């Protein structure tokens, strides 16, 4: 009876802590987050940007397009411009690691926040708590 109780306790413990849940994928949760930003673009972020927090960003946005792609801070970048806001996902190996939202802050400057992705045990894409992020166009 003790062995059965011990085995059941281990099974419950194993089920309670699902460590193999997938992290947010850029093609699924990331795309859904970006698609939810629906305003037409009112700015273009194409070019090289410098961020104290992340280093250089090389962003590409075609004229009239909302879609943004590029790289920076050791990550691939996928994003959209919605109105006067830039929404970016930082990802590696198809997994979202950070989310950022930035708005114009003077000429050739963007300011906003970035946050870590949520842990594998929580639903959603990125955490509520965030840190400041600033970018200046070169």
Protein language model regions, located:
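Amphipathic/hydrophobic helical signal segments and adjacent flexible N-terminal regions
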Residues: 2-48, 52-54, 113, 122-138
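Central antiparallel beta-sheet cores of small beta-barrel/beta-sandwich binding domains
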Residues: 30-106, 111-118
């Amino acid at each position: 009876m003790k062995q059965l109780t011990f085995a059941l306790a281990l099974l419950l413990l194993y089920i309670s802590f699902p460590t193999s849940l997938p992290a947010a994928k850029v093609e699924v949760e990331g795309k859904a987050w970006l698609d939810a930003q629906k305003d037409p673009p009112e700015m273009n972020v194409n070019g090289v940007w410098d961020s104290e927090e992340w280093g250089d960003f090389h962003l590409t946005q075609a004229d009239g397009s909302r879609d943004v792609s590029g790289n920076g801070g050791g990550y691939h970048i996928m994003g959209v411009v919605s109105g006067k806001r830039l929404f970016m996902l930082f990802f590696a190996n198809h997994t979202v690691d950070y989310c950022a939202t930035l708005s114009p802050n003077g000429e050739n400057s963007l300011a906003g926040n970035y946050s870590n992705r949520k842990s594998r045990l929580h639903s959603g894409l990125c955490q509520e708590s965030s840190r400041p992020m600033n970018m200046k166009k070169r």
